[in-house]
Amino acid sequence: MEDIKEKVLETLASLGMTGWGLTPADHDGFTCAATLFLAYQLPPETDPLAGGSYDEATFHNTLIAVRDRGLQMLQPLYEVLDEAGVRHWTVPSGQDPDTLEAPFSAKRAAALAGLGWTGKCSLLVTPRNGPRVVLFNVLMDLEGAGAPTTLRPACGTCTACIDACPQGYLTGAEWRDGIDRAQVIDAFACSSRMEMLGKPIGHKHSCGLCLLACPLGARKATNH
């Protein structure tokens, strides 16, 4: 099993993702979660941090393209796991419409893997790319993930994401383990508005205003 773990670690490191980490998991019999992310940037003309004007289509299409690219990049990992007979499952994107919760929290797994922290925008914030990342989670029946490693939130007194939300859905509370989501964000109001705005364009509005305002996102990232 140790040889398999080493092969998995080597493969994860070779995929070309912006960042990745392992953390123990306890979900549907899986014991380990590999959390990976790709960082992205927008064209200057549609990037608020570069003086541009937010464009929904550009933001949405960027997310789709980066997600599709990331899923393709995971193929070598699947091959290694399949060859070793290790059961695995890639957590799909999306949430339960009634609870607005995912079947497995990619954000929490990423935080436990030491990749970032949950910011005042209720999204994962990474030290180098802020919240401008697309997350991927592969759950595996693999032992030896190691103890969780968490980062202290580094948002400090920054309120950029809060100020960027035109509806005031962010409260300004700093996320901490065990806090009720409603104390940080009115998730249902936010989701309802994104659905309303999305009707004319045929998909739920992606609305990246809060995450694109994070000053950490100004660091250079390469779209894959």
What kind of region is each of these model predictions?
Residues 1-68:
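Non-catalytic, usually N-terminal nucleic-acid engagement modules in DNA/RNA processing proteins
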